[in-house]
């Protein structure tokens, strides 16, 4: 049941060196720098996104994800979700408007998986970058690198998947689009959606809490993914796997690392889903094909390198 959460809105990442990180996220991925704040954070967006930012970079000594944020339809829905989280037993933290530049107040909570999430209703509307709102051209001609279309999702590793599933489905209004079941029928991976996408956030069982597997950005075509692979080679960027196709979600994809070790994905295509669809199910014994549909063999680095 929809509770008023519309979409993934932003992610804040820790990076070791800001100038090197910007080479990755701006020059290679093609995000646009929109702002900086007095904490030294840098605010980025993809060109089709209408709000001011979707990625925030913060320079620290350890890489990883600080939090992921979801945009809520309005302040009334935000207040109701805050009440629902509190009634469910979640400790919520209030962050005032302006703590993130150009963003309204945020309600932050920690999932049983150990990850921090936040909800907000207001962010400065800047429109799509480089095109007019009336009679817009197909795309801006001065995009850089891979010309990422949008911030799409995060895949996260942590424990307590059943409790995390209950929180996201019962309180926040997500639904289960795809899953992986082990030989006992226990869900070891859950792909949760707010929309018609195969996932807006996904969780994989892992004994450590609060780990980041990757942040993903959408491209339009398979040719764009192949071009991304060319750019990865041209820039001598550390590659993880791909180009290939997933069995899970059926997305066509490539994975690579930022200079701090955070994993990035760019992808195109993939399954669509609706809340009345039965979840797409893969079996853990076939996980090689579920993740790497062509090779059908697991890559240890893909499974174990986390931030």
Curated annotation (Swiss-Prot):
This protein's UniProt keywords: Aromatic hydrocarbons catabolism, Dioxygenase, Iron, Metal-binding, Oxidoreductase, Repeat
Organism: Pseudomonas aeruginosa
Entry similarity comment: Belongs to the extradiol ring-cleavage dioxygenase family.
Residue sites binding Fe cation per the record: 153, 214, 265
Gene Ontology BP term (one): toluene catabolic process
Catalytic reactions on record: catechol + O2 = (2Z,4E)-2-hydroxy-6-oxohexa-2,4-dienoate + H(+)
The keyword Signal is annotated on this UniProt entry: no
Family matches, as PROSITE patterns: EXTRADIOL_DIOXYGENAS (PS00082), VOC (PS51819)
Assembly and binders: Homotetramer.
Superkingdom to which the source organism belongs: Bacteria
Cofactor dependency: Fe(2+)
Domain VOC: 7-122, 150-269
InterPro entries (UniProt xref): Catechol_2-3_dOase, Fosfomycin_Res_Enzymes, Glyas_Bleomycin-R_OHBP_Dase, Glyas_Fos-R_dOase_dom, VOC, Xdiol_ring_cleave_dOase_1/2, XylE-like_N
Gene Ontology MF, one: ferrous iron binding
Transmembrane portions of the chain: none
EC number: 1.13.11.2
CDD domains associated with the record: 2_3_CTD_C (cd07243), 2_3_CTD_N (cd07265)
Gene3D superfamilies tied to this protein: 2,3-Dihydroxybiphenyl 1,2-Dioxygenase, domain 1 (3.10.180.10)
Pathway: Xenobiotic degradation; toluene degradation
Protein known as: Metapyrocatechase
